[in-house]
């Protein structure tokens, strides 16, 4: 038996079909010394549902992708495969603000030596109102799209995803000087005279 293997170097904008789904390669958009930033990023669209896979890409390359595509790419996704096992080097605010996923799936081992998932990206996902599904809690996770909605099943029936409804309704505190916003429990809240309240994460984003 002879096995022939072909390799193909992708470039941003490459498209191919996967059954009835359309796959678009959206990154990386340049070369990097850091191997994690060379992860292939794929946008998978099936019907009106969208999945985004970012591999181990870090915030530097996330931001470069946003700059490269500008307004030519719709980053909104129903499901985000959270970058780098939910490391604090990935899933930055700017990138997450564009994607605004309904669901975030985190692949990681239980009690891993890296401390994943890190608190910072978890906080960002919660602030965005994302429902978080973790393999260390749920076991194997399967997402199924019918082209209109995405449904999930998981191995550990005794566990449930983290429901983000409360996070989506949290009041956020904006700093009128720095133009940044914080969750109410942040240790770096602005002085009262410089603060402004937003009723939701999206309201804070819309205010710039």
Name each region found by the language model.
Residues 1-168:
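Non-globular, low-confidence helical/coil segments that flank catalytic cores
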Residues 155-156, 160-208:
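Mature, structured domains enriched in cysteine- and short glycine motifs
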């Amino acid at each position: 038996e002879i096995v022939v293997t072909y390799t193909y170097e992708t470039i941003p904008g490459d498209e191919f079909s996967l059954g009835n789904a359309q796959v678009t390669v959206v990154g990386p958009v340049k070369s990097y010394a850091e191997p994690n930033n060379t992860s292939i990023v794929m946008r998978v669209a099936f019907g009106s549902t969208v999945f985004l896979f970012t591999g181990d890409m870090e915030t530097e390359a996330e931001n470069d992708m946003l700059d490269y595509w500008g307004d030519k790419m719709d980053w909104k996704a129903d499901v985000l495969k959270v970058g780098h096992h939910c490391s604090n080097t990935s899933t930055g605010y700017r990138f997450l603000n564009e994607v605004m996923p309904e669901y975030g799936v985190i692949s990681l081992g239980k009690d891993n030596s890296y401390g994943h998932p890190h608190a910072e990206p978890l906080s960002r996902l919660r602030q965005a109102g994302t429902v978080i599904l973790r393999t260390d809690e749920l076991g194997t996770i399967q997402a199924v799209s019918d082209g209109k909605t995405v449904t999930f099943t998981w191995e550990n029936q005794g566990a449930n995803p983290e429901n983000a409804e409360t996070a989506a309704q949290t009041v956020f505190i904006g700093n009128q000087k720095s133009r940044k916003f914080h969750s109410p429990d942040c240790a770096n809240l602005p002085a009262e005279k410089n603060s402004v309240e937003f009723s939701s994460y999206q309201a804070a984003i819309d205010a710039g």
